[in-house]
Amino acid sequence: MEKFTIKDLTDNLKFEIISGQDKLDTEIKSYGINRAGLELADYFKPFKDQSEWRATLMSTKESGYMLQFDEETKIKKYTQLMKCGIPVLIITNKFKDKTLIKVAKRLNFPLLRSDYPITIQLVQKIQDIYDIYFSPTAEEHAALMNIFGTGVLIKGKSGIGKSELCLDLIKHNHLFIGDDRIILTNKSNKIIGRVHPILKNLIEIRGIGIFDIVKSNGYQVIMNESPVELVVELVEYKEQNIDNSDRLGNDWSKFKILGVEIEHIQIPVSAGRSLVNIIESAVAQFKINKSKQFENVFDVIHKRTKEFLSSKK
């Protein structure tokens, strides 16, 4: 897990920094957002480790509660809150008590303000950022495309043609997420893939070199991230002169990523095969398999065979 700091939060959500500018490198170690209701009512849950304290949010309800107290009481409550171990305080524009700002500046405590009009939307945005840093993460040497609305992780040994396949898929109006280094994150038991920031929008084609997909094809072919629903593994068509590839369309297996099982299929690569059409067909079949229209191919063949034999009697 990457180190997650107050600065990461402010950079991603463009918060106004009211105080504690020199403490933005403070690490946020606990997942989630806390509302300050109980703490403002003088109840502080004892933690063995200070790092268990979450970032704390205050908005309309907390403001209304605090405005009923005199100045001395408010200063005492805010001071207790800022000294209890929380890493940062976030307020919305709906928080009207200016005493908080006065106390935060006196203590040089990290206080941020958001202009999000709806508090629940702000909480969701913060949680989305947290997911990037706190969720289980892995890295795959692969490419990631979104094909017909389905996130497809394309694996295979180096030099087998993953990048070239991505380029062909882009020409077919499918969306490019990344190539070579794909970062996979488990968010609520769903695998989300994105490219390593260093390689964003870049692709390497042997014989040509590295070039920028945005500059050559435009922003319309780019996605920042995508759920991964299908893993396609490119394999050599023949190994030791034996063709082990599936010919009946029943060889769908599972590929485990961060504890989540993803549909997986191997596609043999050989000269003369149109990989783009094969990949598109594989994704189409995957979508059919998930739909109510799915019918097992062996059942279909068995049914047709019986009908054919019956017609010959």
Curated annotation (Swiss-Prot):
Q: Which InterPro entries match?
A: HPr(Ser)_kin/Pase (IPR003755), Hpr_kin/Pase_C (IPR011104), Hpr_kin/Pase_Hpr_N (IPR011126), P-loop_NTPase (IPR027417), Ser_kin/Pase_Hpr-like_N_sf (IPR028979)
According to its UniProt record, which cofactors does this protein need? Answer: Mg(2+)
Listed SUPFAM superfamilies: HprK N-terminal domain-like, PEP carboxykinase-like
Q: Where is the active site?
A: H141, K162, D180 (proton acceptor), R247
Renumbered to this chain, region (Important for the catalytic mechanism of dephosphorylation) spans 268-273
BP-aspect Gene Ontology terms? regulation of carbohydrate metabolic process
The UniProt keywords, alphabetically, are:
ATP-binding, Carbohydrate metabolism, Kinase, Magnesium, Metal-binding, Multifunctional enzyme, Nucleotide-binding, Serine/threonine-protein kinase, Transferase
Q: Name one GO molecular function term.
A: phosphorelay sensor kinase activity
Its Enzyme Commission number(s) read 2.7.11.-, 2.7.4.-
Name the residues that bind Mg(2+): S163, E204
Give the residues the record marks as binding ATP: G156, K157, S158, G159, I160, G161, K162, S163
Give the reactions, separated by semicolons, that this protein catalyses. Answer: [HPr protein]-L-serine + ATP = [HPr protein]-O-phospho-L-serine + ADP + H(+); [HPr protein]-O-phospho-L-serine + phosphate + H(+) = [HPr protein]-L-serine + diphosphate
The organism sits in which domain of life?
A: Bacteria
One Pfam entry for this protein is: Hpr_kinase_N
- Region feature (Important for the catalytic mechanism of both phosphorylation and dephosphorylation): 203-212
Family statement:
Belongs to the HPrK/P family.
Function recorded in the entry:
Catalyzes the ATP- as well as the pyrophosphate-dependent phosphorylation of a specific serine residue in HPr, a phosphocarrier protein of the phosphoenolpyruvate-dependent sugar phosphotransferase system (PTS). HprK/P also catalyzes the pyrophosphate-producing, inorganic phosphate-dependent dephosphorylation (phosphorolysis) of seryl-phosphorylated HPr (P-Ser-HPr).
What else the UniProt entry mentions is: Both phosphorylation and phosphorolysis are carried out by the same active site and suggest a common mechanism for both reactions.
Q: How does it assemble?
A: Homohexamer.
Q: What is known of its domains?
A: The Walker A ATP-binding motif also binds Pi and PPi.
Query: Can you name this protein?
Result: HPr kinase/phosphorylase
Q: Which species is the source of this protein?
A: Mycoplasma mycoides subsp. mycoides SC (strain CCUG 32753 / NCTC 10114 / PG1)
Tell me the organism's taxonomic lineage.
Answer: Bacteria, Bacillati, Mycoplasmatota, Mollicutes, Mycoplasmataceae
